[in-house]
Amino acid sequence: MSPEGKEMRYRISDIARELQVSPQEVLHFVKEAGGKVASTSSMVKGPMRDLILDQFSDEKKLVDETRKIREEKQLRLSRLEEQSRKTYEKEQQLKDTISGRPERAAAKPRTEVPSESVEPEPVKEMPETVAEPEVTGVVSEPDENVAAVAEEVKSPVEETSETVAEKNDVEGQVSYEVPQKIGGLTVFGTLDVQSSLGMGGEADKKKQRKKRFKEQADELKDEFDIKAKEGGKEREAGGESRKPVKKGSEETKKTTVESTSAKKKKGKKKKKPEVDEKTIEKNIRSTISGMDDTSGSGSSRQKFRKMRKIEREKELEEAEAIKEAERSIIRVTEFATAHELADLMGILPKEIIQHCFTMGKFVTINQRLDKETIELVAMEFGFDAEFVSEVEATEVTEIEDEEEELEIRPPVVTIMGHVDHGKTSLLDYIRSSNVVAGESGGITQHIGAYEVSLDGDRKITFLDTPGHEAFTAMRARGAQVTDIVILVVSADDSVMPQTVEAINHSKAAGVPIVVAINKIDKPDANPEKIKTQLSEAGVLVEDWGGEYQCQEISAKQGTGIDALMEKVLTEAEIRELKANFSEDVPSRGIIVEAELDKGKGVVSTVLVQRGFLKVGDPFVAGHTMGKVRALMDERGKRIREAGPSQPVSVLGFEDLPQSGDLFTVMPSDREAREIAQKRQIIRREHEFRRSTRVKLDSIARQIKEGLMKELSVILKADTDGSIQALADGLMKIHNDEVKVQIIHQGVGQITETDVLLAAASDAIIIGFRVRPNVNAKRLAEKEDLDVRFYSVIYHVIEDIEQALEGMLSPELHEESIGSLEIRQVFKVPKIGNVAGCYMLEGKIFRDSKVRLLRDGVQIYDGVLDSLKRFKDDVKEVDAGYECGLNLKGYSDIKVGDIVEGYRIVEKKRKL
């Protein structure tokens, strides 16, 4: 089901946290409202959540108001930050202006000078006067008019238009326009007096510039503060705009001088903050470098470095967040003890016991806790519980192999595709043996693992998976252990559902696909159509510009098989498949298939993935352990050891493992037994709790009997993979009225225990490629039990479907059989009204159900009380004849009414 189709569910504790109320209050309300919940970690649906929000509406309103206030506060803070940022940018612009023109920016006079004419000083005193950083002169004549220059230097009223323009750039508030001709002088530009006189060298200039930096920064900071305050006052007063100053106005000049001097006096009264000279120089250098690098390769490199730095910081933050989240997650099995849970959380067991006591549960240090209790305890101590299987919890840790220890290994290739598309026939030709002859119905029903040697000492391990839809789990397991998938599609058929499923399994496991279009020797073969359908399924072959290799083959004639093998080996070389071939490392593998042999015991097919598996190695696999008694290849020949990518049959298991379990060699029998026992204890606890719940559920079903019918089944098969495929296929067959209930499933022959269980639970026994022993057969005949034997899996599914359809209530259909018209009404004493009718169509029977229609409206529905022709009682009347009848319990009949006869027909339902 898609996520859109699922109904949203909410945890009670999360709802309580959202409303900021006690979870117990919410739990109490849900129980009163009729909700079936056990604890505060239980889930409720959307309607119940809406009911909770309505009940706690006052609390929700308070929470919403608090959230709104918090958001408004955050908005105000963000606005203040934005305002501070803009203020900082203005300061930076002022500093940039200074760094670009330090001597012009220093042209503002610092003292108020009277407007009277001042006598010019001698020329020899000029260096001392001009040495101040505020002085910039304006001259229009050569050096002999130095007196006039000195006069203009001391008079701020007679500043030139260029000097005023510089001041406008700095202040950004008032635009000044000063007459160009003052005192009879013509202004052409500004001139640095010291440079014009040729006094002082480059070293003196640098020293003077450094001395002036601090004073300039102080002045600019004071002026900026004054301007900002004045601008704020003006905005408060109504934001009146300043009028431009007219040319030639003496009042304007006086006002300008007075306002400038007043601002400077006001600025002097305020204590200047001390600014570090190194900070100023650093800011100026960074600003200048930024202005210089606004374009070109340097700017792009700088941006790239900055982006890389931001990305690294972001990656570090994400990694830290992931580590923090992982630290707060504990991986625990479902029925862990209080002591084990305390060890995982790093606390004392007594703290868990105390917390359970406050919850109303009395536990001991070795008592096993259920899932809900573990979640609540972990949440209380700030952890999130992630439940894992008992195998994952006791997983054996291994040291990772070094790169120099790895060697090239043969690829593991899985052949996938739809039923009867030629997967096993392809493997037949490669192995030069007839595998199909050994399979019932000509279809593969096990995962077969085979090793094939090609030219040049090259080897490939093949896994042949079933193509029938019941073997979805098998195909998924095959995709997990494989390196390359050969997708077989018949050229005379099309891309079928199992073909698409195989593609999805391969893509989900990240396994490359090599397409083999089979049966090209047939006359109706159409490989191009197959390629088109594959492209629609997301597999675009290389011939069409895609990335998937494709080869047209004929598995019967051998056409294109060698080219297909070359493409598989090429794909393997690209992937650089490696494994550790050292004999010192403990071996590891995957159990592909497991079965119970009458003479050998438990036999499992293991695909070795690391190291060499030898006879005598102790191992653990899933819930069982053992010691390797014998190793055999796929042809039954005994071998001494098996290396990576080699399939091998292993004897020596104490119990039957499950397909897909991890096979790990242990240092000793004792360690292997300890791990297996831990897993068995957890599994037994899980099965015990589950069986208890099943019994309670069955009691509830007995109370509601009649709502659901069940077909109880006991499954016995030859291999674990077949059991899983059968169980998956049968559990899919159900509807709202009937379903299959698997009482027991196992590998091996049918025993007396199975027969007794079937007799007690009224179940049928299904044997898939297994037979009962003598005692079980005799007992089954005595108990008159239904025992069925099959060798093809879809025959089992078809028979179970038919059995379930027989348990369904039939559909009832109404079938019209005839209609009569009332043409006369007779009143008969002690009987009532009798209708004289004419049979319009069909037939009417004495026991027929009838309805009375008047003007097309039904006014009676019942049965006939009598049916006569003339004075004789009859069983039926055909069309075209007249008859008399009266209705049982009804006498209000009139001329012109229609009597319609019908019967109820039962129709068999389908699943």
UniProtKB/Swiss-Prot annotation:
Residues 417-424 are annotated as: G1. It comes from Chlorobium phaeobacteroides (strain BS1). Its main location: cytoplasm. Residues 80-142, 153-172, 195-309 are annotated as: Disordered. InterPro entries: EF-G-like_DII, EFTu-like_2, IF2_II, IF2_N, P-loop_NTPase, Small_GTP-bd, T_Tr_GTP-bd_dom, TF_IF2_bacterial-like. Residues 408-578 form the tr-type G domain. This is Translation initiation factor IF-2. Residues 518-521 are annotated as: G4. The gene is infB. Residues 442-446 are annotated as: G2. GO terms for molecular function: GTP binding; GTPase activity; translation initiation factor activity.
